[in-house]
């Protein structure tokens, strides 16, 4: 697999999703990543530390320049806990849990986050404003309500299927209520 192509596709998808979700500085962005799927394998079976590092470093660079916080979801072997910066965990009141990821428990994305973040910790659960799922890892449990599917400009990074989610405030009220327009809502 061509690493330059994977990096280019990752950059293109992330920038597109950020434009479509209109995330602001300080927002939380969750990443689910199967490096196995990126390489054309079965999720969890052919994990690649190199691919995890390439993708996470690329995303951290993009989000960091915009002041958006990255949370990297692990696999079910760590109960889908997430790696974030300690400062983010403290700022958002997130519960820190004790686990250190491995290639096959947490995954390549989490290992990369531990490598590239300043002071990484694992947290049990977040409510991110948006997120990107590379390889059908199921990030929905970590994106706040109301979730809105975002169609990325590319359907795949490498061989991995790509989906994205944004969120919007709940619409409350009744027939007489009025709602402000925003970039996410589809009416």
Swiss-Prot record:
Family note: Belongs to the UPF0340 family.
SUPFAM superfamilies for the chain: TTHA0583/YokD-like
Name of the featured protein: UPF0340 protein SP_0663
Organism of origin: Streptococcus pneumoniae serotype 4 (strain ATCC BAA-334 / TIGR4)
Gene3D superfamilies tied to this protein: Hypothetical protein TT1679
InterPro entries to which the protein is assigned, alphabetical: Antibiotic_NAT-like (IPR028345), DUF436 (IPR006340)
């Amino acid at each position: 697999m061509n690493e330059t192509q994977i990096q280019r596709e990752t950059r293109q998808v992330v920038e597109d999703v950020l434009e479509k979700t209109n995330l602001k500085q300080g927002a939380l962005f969750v990443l689910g990543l199967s490096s196995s799927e990126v390489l054309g394998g079965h999720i969890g079976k052919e994990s690649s530390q190199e691919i995890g590092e390439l993708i996470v470093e690329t995303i951290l660079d993009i989000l960091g320049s915009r002041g958006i916080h990255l949370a990297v979801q692990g696999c079910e072997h760590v109960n889908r806990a997430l790696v974030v910066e300690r400062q983010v965990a403290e700022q958002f009141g997130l519960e820190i849990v004790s686990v250190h990821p491995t290639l096959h428990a947490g995954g390549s994305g989490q290992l990369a986050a531990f490598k590239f973040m300043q002071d990484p910790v694992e947290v049990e659960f977040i409510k991110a404003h948006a997120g990107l799922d590379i390889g059908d890892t199921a990030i929905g449990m970590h994106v706040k309500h109301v979730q809105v599917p975002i169609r990325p400009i590319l359907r795949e990074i490498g061989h991995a299927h790509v989906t994205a989610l944004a969120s919007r405030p709940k619409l409350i009220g009744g027939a007489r209520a009025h709602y402000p327009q925003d970039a996410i809502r589809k009416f």
